Amino acid sequence: MDTVALGASGPASTRLSLQLGDAQSGLRAVTESSGSAVVVHVGGDIDASNETVWQRLVTRSAAIAIAPGPFVIDVRDLEFMGSCAYAVLAQESVRCRRRGVNLRLVSNQPIVARTIAACGLRRLLPMYTSVENALAPPA
């Protein structure tokens, strides 16, 4: 996979070591692309203080994905994911589907699954336990 650092300068890394936008944002991300697929690995926190940075990251990364995709967002290294993060993902999922790309979320945290279910977002934000599973073609 080619590694692309969005919103940060300097060399890209496969580790979650890049700060996006404001160094105080608390959000780290690395975006990788391979063929039509794009994977974003995120860590840190997503809340109202960095919602704009999160929105920009998701939108720019999704734009790289080409149908049939998928566009995978790995949130396993997030320490906090506020409601604004789910709203951004749901909106981007709708935009991706219009382009023939499926947004897939990777998480092993029960709270993420419960939040998605409680908000009625299961169809828009299908969850996978690993990036490998999320990248696999549908059975």
Residue ranges and their predicted role:
Residues 125-130, 134:
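Short acidic-hydrophobic, aromatic-tinged amphipathic segments that line or gate anion-handling sites
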Residues 30-32, 106, 128:
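General small-molecule cofactor/ligand-binding pocket signal
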Residues 135-139:
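Acidic/histidine-enriched, glycine/proline-rich intrinsically disordered or flexible terminal extensions
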Residues 45-125:
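Amphipathic alpha-helical interaction surfaces in cytosolic regulatory modules
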Residues 4-5, 12-59, 75-77:
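STAS-typified acidic loop motif
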